[in-house]
Design a protein with these regions (language model features):
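A cross-family phosphate/adenosyl-ligand binding-site feature
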Residues: 1-8, 16-105, 112, 116, ...
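Short beta-strand segments
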Residues: 6-7, 36-37, 69-70, 111-113, ...
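Short glycine/serine/threonine-rich phosphate/pyrophosphate-binding segments
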Residues: 12-22, 43-44, 76, 91-95, ...
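Short, acidic/small-residue loops that bind anionic groups at enzyme active sites
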Residues: 29-30, 34-37, 124-148, 152-155, ...
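Accessory alpha-helical/coil subdomains and C-terminal extensions
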Residues: 99-100, 108-113, 119-123, 151-172, ...
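Glycine- and acidic-rich phosphate- and metal-coordinating loops
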Residues: 277-285
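Flexible loop/turn connectors
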Residues: 298-310
Length: 359
């Protein structure tokens, strides 16, 4: 058995742990493993297939990033090409990818990725490519699994940043607005905001009223608390407003969210007169060594993916259900983002602690 491994989309702490688990689990079954570099680019645009043995994955569990590299621009169904004038256009090269996969003599693919990669894998599976998926995103927004690796590390990083903002905000009697990743799901903002004792948490799932946000800050001021911490998810939006974008979808790309923290900070300063600063934590949330939880989850996902291949359970994704690793059909995963339920215990906890959610 020859299996290929690919990592697509944004990087997340724990990717290397998955790769190591797949390679080791395959090795002890007598199988050979190969890595496709930079997502599917290693099959489509250059000779990027590398053997992965015990030596190649030794000592990588604790490393952030991915030893295979990754990209957000390698969708074979929307592959970016350029004409003679240098203008970019999209072309469907999925058949080329399947042909290259077969020509390489692979028997199965372990695709590690988020919602975009899962959609690609589903469409490739429908073309006959034998694939098993491992969910990967710091956003924790993939349906079919209660947790994705990378999320715990991102929350830890964000919480540490919020902790540090408290001292500078209090020293200057300022309002600090920190923008966190998550795209259209507020998991990172909710978990880190709650853990970091934020005063306001703004989520994509709950459109906010800026006056409600300012009212919370005024009440703290009246109580002698002359600083406030506002945590805002990048996909949060005001009532009757739109999501802030840094860049709209172009050829081979998706919308880039961002800018809401600056907008909220300006509004707070205008309505309250309080000196307000904004901070975008950005890609720090993707970096660093994975937490113990993320390492363990990634290792479990990787070994479960190999077991799925052994059972020829292609067209599935491994996921966490309760305390067990399960398999979910890709057709029941794609196009079904998992957002924060409005009645979940964590939301209720935030409200019970007096945290404003802007509504």
């Amino acid at each position: 058995m020859r299996i290929a491994i690919s990592t697509g989309g944004g990087d997340a702490p724990g990717l290397n742990a998955v790769i190591r688990a797949v390679v080791l689990s395959a090795h002890y079954r007598g199988w050979k493993s190969y890595g496709i570099q930079r997502g599917y680019e290693g099959l489509l645009s250059f000779n990027g297939v590398v053997p992965l043995g015990l030596a190649e994955v030794r000592g990588i569990t604790h490393l952030g990033g991915t030893i295979l590299g990754t990209t957000n621009h390698g969708n074979p169904f929307r592959y970016v090409m350029r004409n003679e004038q240098g203008e970019a256009y999209e072309q469907d090269r999925s058949d080329d990818l399947v042909a290259a996969f077969q020509a390489s003599g692979f028997d199965a693919l372990v695709s590690i990725g988020g919602d975009g990669s899962l959609q690609i894998s589903h469409d490739l599976w429908r073309k006959g490519l034998p694939v098993v998926c491992v969910p990967k995103t710091i956003d924790n927004d993939v349906s079919g699994t209660e947790r994705t690796f990378g999320f715990d590390t991102a929350v830890s990083t964000a919480t540490e940043a919020i902790d540090k903002l408290h001292s500078t905000a209090e020293s200057h009697d300022r309002v600090m607005v920190v923008e966190l990743m998550g795209r259209y799901a507020g998991w990172i903002a909710l978990y880190s905001g709650l853990s970091g004792s934020a005063d306001v948490i703004l989520l994509p799932e709950i459109p906010f009223d800026i006056e409600k946000v300012c009212d919370k800050i005024r009440r703290r001021e009246a109580a002698g608390r002359h600083f406030s911490i506002v945590v805002v998810a990048e996909g949060a939006r005001p009532k009757d407003g739109s999501i802030e974008l840094l860049e709209r979808r172009g050829v081979g790309t998706v919308d880039r969210l961002g800018g809401i923290a600056s907008k909220v900070a300006r509004a707070i300063e205008h309505h309250t007169g309080k000196e307000t600063r904004s901070l975008v934590l950005g890609h720090l949330q993707r970096g660093g060594s994975p937490t113990t939880y993320d390492r363990l989850l990634a290792l479990r996902f990787g070994s479960a993916a190999v077991r799925a291949i052994a059972d020829r359970a292609f067209g599935t994704m491994v996921g966490l259900t309760g305390s067990d690793i399960s398999r979910v059909a890709l057709e029941n995963v794609v196009g079904r983002a998992w957002n924060v339920p409005l009645n979940c215990d964590t939301i209720r906890t935030a409200r019970d602690l007096g945290i404003s959610l802007g509504d």
